[in-house]
Amino acid sequence: MPEPLMEIFKMNGIIFDIKRFATHDGNGIRTTVFLKGCPMKCVWCQNPEGISAERKPLFFKNRCIKCRICEKFSKEKRAIFENNNFSEQRFSSKDIQNIIENCPACAVQMDSKLVSSNELLKEILRDEIFFTHEGGVTFSGGEPFIQKNFLIEMLKKLKERNIHTAVETALNIDTDILKEALPYLDTVYADLKIFDDEKHKKYTGVSNKLIKKNIEFLLKSSKKENVIIRTPMIPEFTADKENIKKISSFISELYSDVKYEILNYNPLAESKYEMAGKEYCFKENPPLYSGKEMKDFGKTAEENGIKKIIIES
């Protein structure tokens, strides 16, 4: 990460979304905060706007009224909608800001905002009444631990108020960071997407050796009962029984009562790639897996040592 960004993250955080009344990101009713930046480059990423640690512009094609105001700020003197995809390379940062300020339809917006821990806490506490009955706050991304100082500061502030905390992580982080944050976390949702290391490198851009090391640390820690290992079912990449078999065997050998969650494919990500001017990995967006298909994936996990299976269909 560039040094200037590291300095910013020491004082503030960059968030790209806050999802209120979330029911799939932990127990109870939750507020999920999405932190920007990820060291992995999963080709199917469900939140492509969260990969870069820097703030980027998005083009909302459905809002555009083709007024051509953006044209005068383009290096090529072409309106944004005249390209199949919006490319920020055609605009300087100053030009993008001018478009955001002048577009009458708000068709171009930055994908994230800079906030202090106190500002974010104030925003979160608007929902505090809903955190009773096991609700709380979940940090997602991107990779939340990329902004480790900001994340840990937020976790401490929430625990001071006895608010339940959770994190969704791909675990491609230094183990010492995990050790520092764990005392302030009630639940950890940790991804292991692909067991084979070469395939993992090919489709995520990184080795999974550190990820496996961190999973081993978590499943041997005092909080192992509050760790849920997850695998998203991505057609062509992760959704095969051999992958589930190997992951299930690996994690159940580390902790026999491990909780393993199998997540259904999310077809809603495709539109995000269009907004970000990026190409999606699927030419034709696959559908959700059926309930029967998801149960079959779960059966494979159970046959390979998993006692506590969670299926999100």
Role assignments for model-derived ranges:
Residues I15-I69, F86-K94:
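N-terminal pre-triad scaffold of radical SAM enzymes
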Residues P2-N27, P235-S313:
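Auxiliary Fe-S-binding modules of radical SAM enzymes
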Residues C106, E160-R161, N304:
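Conserved dinucleotide-binding and phosphotransfer motif residues
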Residues G26-N27, F34, S52, K56-K61, ...:
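N-terminal-biased segments
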Residues V43-G50, I69-N85, N98-L114:
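Iron-sulfur cluster-binding cysteine motifs and their immediate structural context
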